[in-house]
C-alpha cells in the first residue's frame, strides 16, 4: 500500500523555463492551465494551507465546486462537450488542488510559468510513498525464501513491478484520438473496461486500504504494548530477557516464537509467581486481550472527523521513521556482526537453506511493498520535465529496491546464529529486540505516533471511496460514517486478537490488490490498445499473458503457504 502511510501528494501543474527550488510543498500553476485542469471538487472542510492555517472557501465557491462536481459525472474527462463553463469555475485565488490523502492545498499563481517539481523531488516523493509497513516484514520474507533466493526475488519483483508501473504511465499515451492530459488511472480503466473497470478498481483499492488499516492496528497494538512494557519494566527494574530465549551480551536479541511452534508469540510476558504487581499489570496490559481494545477509545473518535487535514501535517514522520529504522539496523549490524552459513537445500540447527519453497510469501509481501501503480500518474504529473518521467521512475524503483535489500540483508545477516536460529526472525523484525532495548523503544514510539496520525487519513480515504460512490456524499450522516468506522475498527481488533501476523496480512492484501493494479490491468490494457492499433504480436501477447498468470498464481499460492 504500497505505501499508504506517507502520502500527502500535490497535484499542481505548470511548464517552467527557469528553475527555482519548489520543494514538495510548493504548489504552483500557470493561469492558462486552469481551464485544462478542471473540474476541482474540494469540500470546504478539506481545505488546508501549506502554512498550516486551516481555511475554508466561501459558500459561493463551495456551491460552484459542487456544480463542477456534477458536470464531471456527466461524461468522461476526455469529452470536452460538458466541460464546466467559465462562470462556474471559482477564481484562481479560490482554487485548491486535491491531495490523495483527503486534504487540499491552495494554488499559487506565478505568471513566470514555473513551479513544477524537479526530478529530485519527484524521485523522493515516489520513494517516500512506497516506504510503508512492508519494510518491517522484509527480513522475515527473506528468511522464508532463503537468503540467496530472497535477494533474487526482491530484485526480480522490483523489475517486474517497475515494468508494470511503466505500462501504467504509458497507458494514457496509447489513446491518440483522446485528450488524456487530465486523466488518472481509474479513468483509463473505465475507458477500456466500462463500469466494471471503475467498480473493480474501487474494490481492489478498498482491499489495499482496509488491509493497510488492519496491519496498522496490529502494529499499533504491538508498539503500544511494548511501550507500556518498557516503562513498567524500567520502573520495577525487571529484565524481560531472563524469561525468554535470547542472546547473552550487551545487545540482546530474543526469539519470541521459541516454544510456540514457530508462530508469532501473542502472549504478553512471564513473571515470577510471587510478583503480584507484575501479575496485575500482565492481566490488564495484554498484547492480544486488552491493548487492541484500548486503541478503540483513542482512534475511533478520530475516524469520525469530517476532515483529516490536521493529521496530514505529520506526514514527515513517515520519512523520519524510515531513516531511523535504517540507522537502527546499521547500528545493530555493526554491534552484532554477520552470522552466515550457506546450505542450498538442507536446513541446519541454526541456519535456513538458501532455496526454500516458501518464497511466494515474500512475493506477496513485495507486491504491496512495490505498490504505487494506482497513484503513479498523479505523482508524475508534477514533474517539471515530463520527458524524464520514465528515468525518474526507474531511479525511484532502484532506490526502493536498494532500501529493501539493505534492511532485509542486514537484519538477516546480523541475526546472531548461533545461539539463535535464523527461523526466529519475526514477521515484525522489531519483535526480535526486547522491550527494554532503548533504541528499539525509540523506533516503536516513532512508528506508533506516525501510524496514529496516518490511520485517520486511511479511514478518510476508505470513506471517500466507498460512501462517495454509494451515496454520492463522503459524509452522508454521522450514522453512516460511524457504522463504516466500526466495521473497519472491528476488523482491526479481531485480527490483532486472533491473527496478529503482519507478514500474513500484508502478503494476502498485497497479492489481492496487486492482482488487479499491478498485473492484470496494465498488461490487459496494453494488449487491447495494441490490438486496436493492429500492432499486437505473438511475443508481446505471450509475455503479457504470462505476467497476468504470474499475478493470479501469486494470489492463489498465498492460501497454500
From Swiss-Prot:
Main location as per UniProt: membrane
Instruction: Give TM segment ranges.
Output: 120-140, 147-167, 199-225, 284-300, 310-334, 357-377, 395-415, 438-458, 480-500, 508-528, 541-561
Disulfide connectivity?
255-424
Q: Which residues lie on this side of the membrane: Lumenal?
A: 141-146, 226-283, 335-356, 416-437, 501-507
**How does this chain sit within the bilayer?**
Multi-pass membrane protein
What does this protein do, in the record's words?
A: Lysosomal amino acid transporter involved in the activation of mTORC1 in response to amino acid levels. Probably acts as an amino acid sensor of the Rag GTPases and Ragulator complexes, 2 complexes involved in amino acid sensing and activation of mTORC1, a signaling complex promoting cell growth in response to growth factors, energy levels, and amino acids. Following activation by amino acids, the Ragulator and Rag GTPases function as a scaffold recruiting mTORC1 to lysosomes where it is in turn activated.
Compositionally biased, Basic and acidic residues: which spans?
Answer: 7-22
Family per record: Belongs to the amino acid/polyamine transporter 2 family. SLC38A9 subfamily.
Motif, CRAC motif: chain positions: 457-463
> Where does this protein reside within or beyond the cell?
Lysosome membrane; Late endosome membrane
Question: A GO biological process this protein is involved in?
Answer: glutamine transport
Using the UniProt annotation, give the residues that carry a glycan (glycosylation sites).
239, 248, 266, 274
Q: Which residues lie on this side of the membrane: Cytoplasmic?
A: 1-119, 168-198, 301-309, 378-394, 459-479, 529-540
Q: What is the effect of changing residue 90 to A?
A: Abolishes association with the Ragulator complex
Q: Which reaction does it catalyse?
A: L-leucine(in) = L-leucine(out); L-tyrosine(in) = L-tyrosine(out); L-glutamine(out) = L-glutamine(in); L-asparagine(out) = L-asparagine(in)
Q: What is this protein called?
A: Neutral amino acid transporter 9
Cite the domain annotation text.
The cytosolic N-terminus part of the protein mediates interaction with the Ragulator complex. The cytosolic N-terminus part of the protein destabilizes the LFC and thereby triggers GAP activity of FLCN:FNIP2 toward RRAGC. The cytosolic N-terminus part of the protein mediates interaction with the Rag GTPase heterodimer in a RRAGA GDP-loaded state dependent and upon arginine binding, leading to the GDP release and SLC38A9 dissociation from the activated Rag GTPase heterodimer. The CARC and CRAC motifs mediate binding to cholesterol.
Protein modification: Glycosylated.
MF GO annotations? amino acid transmembrane transporter activity; arginine binding; cholesterol binding; guanyl-nucleotide exchange factor activity; L-amino acid transmembrane transporter activity; L-arginine transmembrane transporter activity; L-asparagine transmembrane transporter activity; L-glutamine transmembrane transporter activity
Q: What is the effect of changing residue 60 to A?
A: Does not affect association with the Ragulator complex. Abolishes the interaction with the Rag GTPases heterodimer complex
Summary of subunit composition and partner proteins: Associated component of the Ragulator complex (composed of LAMTOR1, LAMTOR2, LAMTOR3, LAMTOR4 and LAMTOR5). Associated component of the Rag GTPases heterodimers (composed of RRAGA, RRAGB, RRAGC and RRAGD); this interaction is independent of the Ragulator complex but depends on the nucleotide loading state of the Rag GTPase heterodimer. Interacts with TM4SF5. Interacts with NPC1; this interaction inhibits cholesterol-mediated mTORC1 activation via its sterol transport activity.
- Alphabetical keyword list: Amino-acid transport, Disulfide bond, Endosome, Glycoprotein, Lysosome, Membrane, Metal-binding, Sodium, Transmembrane, Transmembrane helix, Transport
Amino acid at each position: 500500500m504500497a505505501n499508504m502511510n506517507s502520502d500527502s501528494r500535490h497535484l499542481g501543474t505548470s511548464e517552467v523555463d527557469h528553475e527555482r527550488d519548489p520543494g514538495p510543498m510548493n504548489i504552483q500553476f500557470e493561469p492558462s492551465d486552469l481551464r485544462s485542469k478542471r473540474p476541482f471538487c474540494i469540500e470546504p472542510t478539506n481545505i488546508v494551507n501549506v502554512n498550516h492555517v486551516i481555511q475554508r472557501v466561501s459558500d459561493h465557491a463551495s456551491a460552484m465546486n459542487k456544480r463542477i462536481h456534477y458536470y464531471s459525472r456527466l461524461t468522461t474527462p476526455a469529452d470536452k462537450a460538458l466541460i464546466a463553463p467559465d462562470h462556474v469555475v471559482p477564481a484562481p485565488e479560490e482554487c485548491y488542488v486535491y491531495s490523495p490523502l483527503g486534504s487540499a492545498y491552495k494554488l499559487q499563481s506565478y505568471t513566470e510559468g514555473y513551479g513544477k517539481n524537479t526530478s529530485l523531488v519527484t524521485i523522493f516523493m515516489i520513494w517516500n510513498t512506497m516506504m510503508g509497513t512492508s519494510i518491517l516484514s522484509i527480513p522475515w520474507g527473506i528468511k522464508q525464501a532463503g537468503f540467496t533466493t530472497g535477494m533474487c526475488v526482491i530484485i526480480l519483483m522490483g523489475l517486474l513491478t517497475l515494468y508494470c508501473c511503466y505500462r501504467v504511465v504509458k497507458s494514457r499515451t496509447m489513446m491518440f484520438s483522446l485528450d488524456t492530459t487530465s486523466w488518472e488511472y481509474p479513468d483509463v480503466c473505465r475507458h477500456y473496461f466500462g463500469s466494471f473497470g471503475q467498480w473493480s478498481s474501487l474494490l481492489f483499492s478498498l482491499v489495499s486500504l482496509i488491509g493497510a488499516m488492519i496491519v496498522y492496528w496490529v502494529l499499533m497494538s504491538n508498539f503500544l504494548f511494548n511501550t507500556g512494557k518498557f516503562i513498567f519494566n524500567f520502573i520495577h527494574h525487571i529484565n524481560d530477557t531472563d524469561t525468554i530465549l535470547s542472546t547473552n551480551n550487551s545487545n540482546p536479541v530474543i526469539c519470541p516464537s521459541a516454544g510456540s511452534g514457530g508462530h508469532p508469540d501473542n502472549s504478553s510476558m512471564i513473571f515470577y509467581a510471587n510478583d503480584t504487581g507484575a501479575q496485575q499489570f500482565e492481566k490488564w496490559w495484554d498484547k492480544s486481550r486488552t491493548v487492541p481494545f484500548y486503541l478503540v477509545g483513542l482512534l475511533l473518535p478520530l475516524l469520525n472527523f469530517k476532515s483529516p487535514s490536521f493529521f496530514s501535517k505529520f506526514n514527515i514522520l513517515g520519512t523520519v521513521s524510515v531513516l531511523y529504522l535504517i540507522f537502527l539496523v546499521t547500528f545493530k549490524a555493526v554491534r552484532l556482526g554477520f552470522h552466515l552459513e550457506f546450505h542450498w537445500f538442507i536446513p541446519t540447527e541454526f541456519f535456513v537453506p538458501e532455496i526454500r519453497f516458501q518464497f511466494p510469501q515474500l512475493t506477496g509481501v513485495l507486491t504491496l511493498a512495490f505498490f504505487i501503480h494506482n497513484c503513479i500518474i498523479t505523482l508524475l504529473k508534477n514533474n517539471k520535465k515530463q520527458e524524464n518521467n520514465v528515468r525518474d521512475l526507474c531511479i525511484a524503483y532502484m532506490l526502493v529496491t536498494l532500501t529493501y535489500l539493505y534492511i532485509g540483508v542486514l537484519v538477516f545477516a546480523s541475526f546472531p546464529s548461533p545461539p539463535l536460529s535464523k527461523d526466529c526472525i519475526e514477521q515484525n523484525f522489531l519483535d526480535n529486540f526486547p522491550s527494554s532495548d532503548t533504541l528499539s523503544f525509540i523506533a516503536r514510539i516513532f512508528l506508533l505516533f506516525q501510524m496514529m496520525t496516518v490511520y485517520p487519513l486511511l479511514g478518510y480515504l476508505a470513506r471517500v471511496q466507498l460512501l462517495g460512490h454509494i451515496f454520492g456524499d463522503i459524509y452522508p450522516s454521522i450514522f453512516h460514517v460511524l457504522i463504516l468506522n466500526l466495521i473497519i475498527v472491528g476488523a482491526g481488533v479481531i485480527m490483532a486478537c486472533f491473527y496478529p501476523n503482519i507478514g500474513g496480512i500484508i502478503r494476502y492484501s498485497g497479492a489481492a490488490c496487486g492482482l488487479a493494479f499491478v498485473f492484470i490491468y496494465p498488461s490487459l490494457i496494453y494488449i487491447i490498445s495494441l490490438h486496436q492499433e493492429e500492432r499486437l504480436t505473438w511475443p508481446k501477447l505471450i509475455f503479457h499473458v504470462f505476467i497476468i498468470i504470474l499475478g493470479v498464481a501469486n494470489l492463489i499460492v498465498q492460501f497454500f503457504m
